[in-house]
Amino acid sequence: EHFGLTEGLSTCAMPSGQQNYPVSLYETIRRFKTMPDAFVCANDFVAMDLVKALNELGYSVPDDIWVCGFDDSQEASYFAPRLTSIHIHGQIMGYTAANLLMTRIEEPSLNYRTVYTETNLILRESTGD
């Protein structure tokens, strides 16, 4: 709700394995009949490519559209505009993954489960902050 994303948020899925990813991203966005208020991307590098594509199409980030990455890469804070991102705690995620793997090895018949871990939203210029 902080971002005002509760209404009008669109989902964009692109086929994986694209040979020319930036061009494919550009072409996918160009076909949108209406643009969402914001994009939340799978990682910061996708978000940075998205910002470039939006700029080429005449959109301004954050004035027209907000963009948020995921993983809070070092590049996110040097990119223009500085990229809002979701910081994941690698040590916690690694510990949790190793724990799940060990449990699965010991008891392979256990049901799969979803695990949630702590993250932090790092607000920067790409969402108007």
Question: Which residues make up each language-model segment?
Answer:
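Bacterial carbohydrate/catabolite-sensing allosteric modules
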Residues: E1-D129
